[in-house]
Amino acid sequence: MNHPFLIAHQQSPAHDRAWRIGLGVVFLWFLIGGIAHFAATRLEMRIVPPYIPWPHATVLLTGVFELLGAAGLLYRPTRRAAGVGLFALTLAVTPANVYMLQRADLFPIPYWLLVARLPLQIALLALIGWSAVRRGG
């Protein structure tokens, strides 16, 4: 049966389970992150580098993109496009992560966690590429 919410390619059960977990992690990452853009807008605005204009609009717009991308992951015909969009969005927000690391004194977050965010972002990009783009639909 070719159902839009099922995976596009049949793999071994272990591989399929890993793929579903990976896709679930990406979905939850962007769902929670997108909600945070609206629930904690002022906090999110603090991480927008000063050279990026309109921090309030930037936070709200990226929150919308995160939520749309997360929703798009759930439906196979839109999964690949959502994955490409989330991949691009993750690259686009990299300056905020770098800014937080450069200005660690402004944020009540342990420095090691700010350092860890950059390799975690690389891992997130790989996970998006594997779970949503390559096997997307």
Segments from the language model and where they lie:
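Membrane-interface extramembranous regions
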Residues: 1-137
